[in-house]
Amino acid sequence: GARSFTGGQVRILTDESHTKARIKEIDGSRIHAQLEQGNVVVVAGFQGVDEHGNITTLGRGGSDTTGVALAAALEADECQIYTDVKGVYTTDPRVVEDARLLKSITFEEMLELASLGAKVLQIRAVEFAGKYKVPLRVLSTFEEGEGTLISLEEDSEMEDPAIAGIAFERDEAKLTVTGVPDVPGIAYKVIGPVSDAGIEVDVIVQNAAEDGTNDITFTVKRAESERAFKILQDVATSLGAKEAVQDTKVCKVSLVGVRKRSPEGIPSKMVKALA
């Protein structure tokens, strides 16, 4: 038979941060008892209970994280997560038709892919699995197949690809302050006010100009670009810089998992492909 439980009933204990609670511990005894009786156990994801008995929700990625946490508590062989794709691909198969399904990938590489724009798994679930050494397998809900195994060990096939995958993020905007005085700590004076406003700064590039000044460029989420640009205009004026410039027609492309055995020239091949 089957038995269903809420997060509170199996005591998925969380902190008190409602809507974004973090899992502290899980009491697996109730689940173990049902499994020993031969029952299938169904546990509601995305929810837990705090020390005072209040129901909490785990926030973004909470359901995947619940599955990983249960697998860790039960010391399962692996945690299988079913999605709308066959597994983890070298890049988004909805954009690139000949993207290849990866048989295996390391936690580190999966974290990089997830943080750089790949949507197949939430970063939080991968971090949890890596911390507790729970092998993850991403499978399709609709098709048969072995999917992709995410683990600590790198698959050591002789014909390993040079890189694990390519991630891209369209939700980007580029901001530049030109003609910034070349003095120690100037990058912080440019970027600090943007970060202080709660805007996440991503890629940062600093270039030296011929006249002894610097150009400082960084990226933010496109939705935050207008607010960041207004802050940057004030910063440029206060620092005596030339001007602040905004560009919302950019995309971030990242090569992930450049292997130790990789042939030389990968960066040049990437630049050539984009030329």
Regions found by a protein language model. Give the residues of each.
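Acidic-aromatic/histidine active-site loop/patch
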Residues: 129
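Internal glycine-rich alpha/beta core junctions
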Residues: 139-141, 145
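Short hydrophobic alpha-helical runs that function as membrane-insertion/retention elements
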Residues: 78-82, 136-138, 202
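Nucleotide/pyrophosphate-binding catalytic subdomain
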Residues: 1-126, 207, 219-221
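A conserved regulatory-domain signal marking ACT and ACT-like small-molecule sensing domains
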Residues: 147-275
